[in-house]
Regions:
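Macromolecular interaction modules
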Residues: 1-107
Length: 107
């Protein structure tokens, strides 16, 4: 299982419309990527490591699926549509990373 994460570094003077991102872009991404995604989540930064410090990331999206190949098979056909939507909510250049997902039981 892998998790594709897309992070938006929080930079001074940057623009990020969390309302549009959460209510338009992410639901569209989940719908377009379809059943290959086992889970789709979004997080909005609220604070940094020190109280009052700006968060390192304006937002983080996570897409869980079986493999990088499965993600790419779902993403490639809709990538233009998703990428053209980015300027509607931000001027931040997103960073994408694929991670192996290791789960630990909570006690």
């Amino acid at each position: 299982m892998i998790k594709a994460i897309i992070v938006y570094p929080n930079k001074p003077g940057s623009r990020f419309d969390a309302d549009y991102y959460l209510n338009v872009h992410m639901p569209m991404a989940a719908r377009l990527l379809g059943p290959a995604m086992k889970a789709v989540t979004a997080e909005i930064g609220v604070d940094g490591g020190t109280p009052g410090q700006a968060p390192a990331f304006a937002a983080i999206a996570a897409f869980t699926c079986e493999s990088v190949e499965d993600f790419m098979l779902a993403f490639k056909p809709v990538s233009d549509q998703l990428q053209k939507d980015i300027p509607k909510y931000t001027d931040i250049e997103p960073i994408i990373q694929f991670n192996n997902l290791i789960e630990f039981p909570a006690k």
